[in-house]
């Protein structure tokens, strides 16, 4: 009997994006009733992240526009997620495919919060609709079980009382809290204690109280049944707007987080402050969300960073989860391949341990905006960005050094000729060579360069151009001399020499990947590598020079065989609804990809 073939590829790991944040906008984290994961969103994706080991994550990308909020059902078997168009998708958590159970359109505008009734049967969804700001419906059928009315502006937050008699509370931008009784749910009263937007309303897990938080810095406590005001936490609770609040599972304490860059822990009974967590001093340290799940107190900063608070010692967080929440534009490896480097279009550079996925951010003064090139060389990693500079950070110190070379125009890529001690940069209007932190040569060009690669054997430099040509230069005595031009059918987007220096591969906007032999710069075979259906963004070589990986705007990665050009492996939907921005091989069977979705993925690929 024939042995079953191993799968041609497998997704080993996802180094997940951080939550997408926006100044002045609270975000909602979703708690898992089984205590294993927590939920947040970024772009079209819902991220299901393991709470004990954040290196484990699952990503759901089925919404056709930005997702704002996702919440587990109390049973833990379903997740409801709401997007910017007002759609709610209810999907299964048990299967890896996350099968869709239902899709409803409760309001015609962005959904800002979702809450399930404790019996899993009803859902309240609120936001910024056209004719109404919220709706209550059955999770199975979508039939209405009441109406959310009585508030005149967008509703930011809603919660179901977790015990009978059922109640719903909503917090709105008209500064009021509305209370509804049912089912069917009818407007009962408004509370007008806040003087600014109400950003969060949450019932205690036992249903005895509910608390509200607003941009006036105040946090109020109300009776869960009668909805009478019980009192206020602090006077006021925070110096800045309060973005979110979270109850301790036993209902005895409350956690609040604020734009004043602090989180505070309160006793519910006496409404007194227990401890304060100072999260930093910069705008990026504003706290925009919090969650209390089991023993984990989690907060999210404006920078997207997730912090696990330490109740025993407020000054030392238990864990800080870093990464990216903007699209990743560059990807590189340290010389020993133990560290993966990623850089995003907001200038953040992250290092990831290639074995465990643990990560940290590079500190110091970097580019502060989009990074277009990255390359490691010994103890340093070099980056170039659209601040028109070349910079370096130290591998050991994990921090940018004071090495800066100002460039005349925007760099699009960099490559290092180690034996010559030269860094070659492809810029929009010129090619520049840098040696010992000085520009030693620049060559004006009539095309716009997109990428650059160097061949240490022949001292050839290959540059991709938007003039549909691949330009080859030779480096002689610190000067670049044109050697040959190779025609493509579209703008050349990326170029790379094979590790054994015998081949050059280039990809273009006309969906093609072309392999050249370096000897004569002629195509290495007569097969057309044209299976992408849109612009190819990036190409990368396996260390043994036998396989080429290409990533495209069409969301797929294709692995091509050099020895057997007719064979290839297609990884469809590698980053769903997101173009592949960069690829690199960790070893001969492992490819790392980054996408517009801010995720970094690790793939195991079988030999072809």
UniProtKB/Swiss-Prot annotation:
WD repeats: 62-101, 106-149, 150-190, 193-232, 237-276, 323-362, 366-403, 444-483, 487-526, 531-570, 575-607
Keyword annotations from UniProtKB, A to Z: Actin-binding, Cytoplasm, Cytoskeleton, Developmental protein, Repeat, WD repeat
Deleted gene: phenotype: Pupals exhibit grossly abnormal epidermal hairs on wings, an abnormal accumulation of F-actin and microtubules, and disruption of the frizzled-based planar cell polarity system. RNAi-mediated knockdown results in F-actin accumulation and moderate border cell migration delays in stage 10 egg chambers. RNAi-mediated knockdown in border cells results in accumulation of F-actin dots, enriched with Arpc1 and GMF.
Subcellular location: Cytoplasm, Cytoskeleton
GO cellular component terms listed in the entry, alphabetical order: cortical actin cytoskeleton; cytoskeleton
PROSITE patterns: WD_REPEATS_2 (PS50082), WD_REPEATS_REGION (PS50294)
SMART domains, per the entry: WD40 (SM00320)
BP term (GO), one: regulation of actin filament depolymerization
Family, similarity comment: Belongs to the WD repeat AIP1 family.
Protein's name in the database: Actin-interacting protein 1
Gene: flr
């Amino acid at each position: 009997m024939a042995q079953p073939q191993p799968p041609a590829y497998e997704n080993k790991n996802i180094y997940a994006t951080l939550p997408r944040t926006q100044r002045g906008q609270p975000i909602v984290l979703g708690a898992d009733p089984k205590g294993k994961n927590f939920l947040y969103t970024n772009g079209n994706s819902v991220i299901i992240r393991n709470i004990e080991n954040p290196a484990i994550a699952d990503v759901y990308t089925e919404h056709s526009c930005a997702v704002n909020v996702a919440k587990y059902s109390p049973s833990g078997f379903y997740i409801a997620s709401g997007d910017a168009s007002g759609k709610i998708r209810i999907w299964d958590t048990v299967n890896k495919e996350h099968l869709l159970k239902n899709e409803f359109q409760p309001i015609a505008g962005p959904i800002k919060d979702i809450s399930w009734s404790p019996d899993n049967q009803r859902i309240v969804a609120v936001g910024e609709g056209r004719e109404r700001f919220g709706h209550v419906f059955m999770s199975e059928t979508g039939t209405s079980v009441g109406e959310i009315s009585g508030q005149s502006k967008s509703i930011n937050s809603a919660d179901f009382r977790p015990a009978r008699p059922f109640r719903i509370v909503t917090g709105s931008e008209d500064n009021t809290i509305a209370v509804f009784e049912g089912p069917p749910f009818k407007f009962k009263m408004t509370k007008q204690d806040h003087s600014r937007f109400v950003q969060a309303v949450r019932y205690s897990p036992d249903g005895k109280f509910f608390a509200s938080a607003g941009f006036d810095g105040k946090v109020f406590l109300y009776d869960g049944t009668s909805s009478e005001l019980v009192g206020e936490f602090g006077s006021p609770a925070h110096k800045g707007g309060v973005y979110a609040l979270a109850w301790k599972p036993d209902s005895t304490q409350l956690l609040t987080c604020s734009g004043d860059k602090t989180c505070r822990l309160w006793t519910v009974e006496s409404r007194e402050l227990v401890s304060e967590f100072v999260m930093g001093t910069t705008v990026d340290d504003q706290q925009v969300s919090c969650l209390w799940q089991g023993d984990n107190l989690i907060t999210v900063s404006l920078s997207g960073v997730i912090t696990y608070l330490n109740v025993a010692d407020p000054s030392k967080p238990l864990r800080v989860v870093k990464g990216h929440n903007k699209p990743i534009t560059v990807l590189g490896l340290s010389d020993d391949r133990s560290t993966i480097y990623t850089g995003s279009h907001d200038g953040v550079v992250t290092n990831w341990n290639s074995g465990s996925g643990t990560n940290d951010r590079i500190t110091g003064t970097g580019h502060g905006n989009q990074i277009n090139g990255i390359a490691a060389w010994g103890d340093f990693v070099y980056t170039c960005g659209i601040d028109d500079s070349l910079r370096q950070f130290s591998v050991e110190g994990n921090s940018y050094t004071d090495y800066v070379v100002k460039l005349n125009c925007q760099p699009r890529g960099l490559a290092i000729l180690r034996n010559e001690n030269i860094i070659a940069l492809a810029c929009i209007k010129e090619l520049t060579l840098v040696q010992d932190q000085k520009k030693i040569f620049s060559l004006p060009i009539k095309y716009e360069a997109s990428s650059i690669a160097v061949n240490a054997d022949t001292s050839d430099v290959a540059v991709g151009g938007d003039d549909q040509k691949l330009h080859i230069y030779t480096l002689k005595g610190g000067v670049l001399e044109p050697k040959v031009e190779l025609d493509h059918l579209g703008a050349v987007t990326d170029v790379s020499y094979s590790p054994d220096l015998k081949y050059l591969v280039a990809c273009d906007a006309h969906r093609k990947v072309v392999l050249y032999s370096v000897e004569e710069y002629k195509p290495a075979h007569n097969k057309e590598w044209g299976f992408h259906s849109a612009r190819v963004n990036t190409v990368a070589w396996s260390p043994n020079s036998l396989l080429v990986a290409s990533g495209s705007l069409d969301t797929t990665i294709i692995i091509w065989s050099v020895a057997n050009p007719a064979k290839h492996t297609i990884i469809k939907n590698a980053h769903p609804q997101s173009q592949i921005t960069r690829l690199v091989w960790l070893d001969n069977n492992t490819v790392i990809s980054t996408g517009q979705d801010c995720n970094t993925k690790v793939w195991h690929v079988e030999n072809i």
